[in-house]
UniProtKB/Swiss-Prot annotation:
Membrane topology term: Multi-pass membrane protein
Keywords: Endoplasmic reticulum, Membrane, Transmembrane, Transmembrane helix
Superkingdom to which the source organism belongs: Eukaryota
Gene name linked to the record: emc4
Protein name in UniProt: ER membrane protein complex subunit 4
Principal localisation: endoplasmic reticulum
Native species: Xenopus tropicalis (Western clawed frog)
Length: 180
């Protein structure tokens, strides 16, 4: 019978349930006596098993996850193109909201770039992945600017700047035939 101090000491250990079909009995009677054998159910091993849940991550999976993060903005570009097509070029609430969201997401991602690069630190190709991430966000921002230009929201013509042009000075004043 196990003492209370042994039970407390064994509480932190991880044990493994296993049934060994090749041995004489499923409870491993060769290791334990008959009285102690009745304490454990069938298939329970009282030997400590190494903790497999806290192992080193597989290098291939880490690289794949880092590339998924880096390629995320590029994967959004086809959806942004579809949204641009569906929104049209008219100026109304819906297309303007779509353009604002298309511009806001890359800006927000570019502002959070240091946090994203911390996720890429475990990768061996972090410079290339960071460059791909940056290019993808800049392409998303360029699409939003292009959509603003195609909707006529960017001041690209001289008539857009009339409020800032000084009115021309009059060179002469003319009047009618009446004297006042």
């Amino acid at each position: 019978m196990a003492t209370p101090s042994n039970l407390v000491a064994n509480r932190g250990r991880r044990f493994k349930w296993a049934i060994e079909f090749g041995s004489g009995g499923s409870r491993g009677r060769g290791e334990r006596g008959g009285l102690q054998d009745s304490m454990y159910p069938v298939g329970y091993s009282d030997k400590q098993v190494p903790d497999t849940s806290v192992q080193e991550s597989d290098h291939i999976l880490v690289e794949k996850r880092c590339w998924d993060i880096a390629l995320g903005p590029l994967k959004q570009i086809p959806m942004n193109l579809f949204i641009m097509y569906m929104a049209g070029n008219t100026i109304s609430i819906f297309p303007i909201m779509m353009v604002c969201m298309m511009a806001w997401r890359p800006i927000q991602a570019l502002l959070a770039t240091p946090a994203t690069f911390k996720l890429l630190e475990s990768s061996g190709q972090r410079f290339l992945q960071g460059l791909v991430y940056l290019i993808g966000n800049l392409l998303g921002l360029a699409l939003a600017v292009y959509k603003c230009q195609s909707m006529g929201l960017l001041p690209t013509h001289a008539s857009d700047w009339l409020a800032f042009i000084e009115p021309p000075e009059r060179m002469e004043y003319t009047g009618g035939g009446l004297l006042l």
